């Protein structure tokens, strides 16, 4: 078992004096909430790009000051707005590391990509040949080392202007566990049959719902994703294994499509004394803390029949729900040939419990001048 990797994703900030620094004030409120409740349960924080709306020194200085409020390591990507002056010099005020680079975190190889510097500005997203070769080397090295991979980039591969299918094909061939992105301005999950992609609602320039952040966990390579709005109650419960039916990428894996006996794991962010599992709204099954993994709880079940089942984990008035597919002796689901890898045609649609309404309300889809 690889273990758990968890990060918090603050959506595109778009910090700008033109709106009275609305994105910045929201960012500060979200940081305060995260600092109060997440603690050691999270490995790092991500900014996915479009941090400063016009890439000015003053905008970055204000962002850097706000970032001091969170005692987690930061990883910061560039978006098209950060590249507005045709370079990323000013962005160095908020990060000492400029993508592309890779780190191994909690047993996972994490690749942080630059998709703006090779372009001409705006949404001219590109990956130059040197970075492409580097990505291939990193993926191959991780495979040899037995390290599952997470990738972080400003936009989906389908938004690249050069070889989007080739990049997404690399991710699929190497079984990347999760690709985390910004750019959309809305919450979304894609499942292209090989890789799960996520995008998180922007912090500034929101067209849907309240500001918030997403929490992503990879549990032995199984991805789970939850959105926490700024005024949502705590604790936050996140079932991390097995996979929800919407996020199945490999039906042959027992943590994607389990048999009659399996273990359920969940993370609880915030104070937790008693955590319970319920199968198909049945009686409470006590969960126990997992030694050595902060905030992770587990319980085992047996005798579950074939078919669709509902899992609920509850803690202090909060809960998480997923649907799972169980197969025992019967044939396992087939995995169809992939179509349109890394493109939002593979969006899973609305998942209201996750803060995903499926409407794709954002300027990049609807032509607004942001």
What feature does the model see in each segment?
Residues 1-62, 352-370:
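N-terminal active-site segment of His-dependent metallophosphoesterases
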Residues 12, 49-50, 79-80, 154, ...:
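Active-site glycine-centered loops adjacent to acidic/histidine catalytic or metal-binding residues
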Residues 48, 139-159:
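Short acidic, glycine-rich surface-loop motifs adjacent to enzyme active sites
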Residues 56-145, 163-178, 184, 188-226:
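Extended active-site neighborhood of metal-dependent phosphoesterases/phosphodiesterases
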Residues 72, 290-300:
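Aromatic sugar-binding surface patches on proteins
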Residues 195-281, 296-328, 332-335:
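Binuclear metal-dependent phosphoesterase catalytic core
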Residues 220-224, 316-370:
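Serine/threonine-biased, Pro/acidic-interspersed low-complexity stretches characteristic
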Residues 282-292:
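Solvent-exposed serine/threonine-rich low-complexity stretches and specific carbohydrate-binding patches
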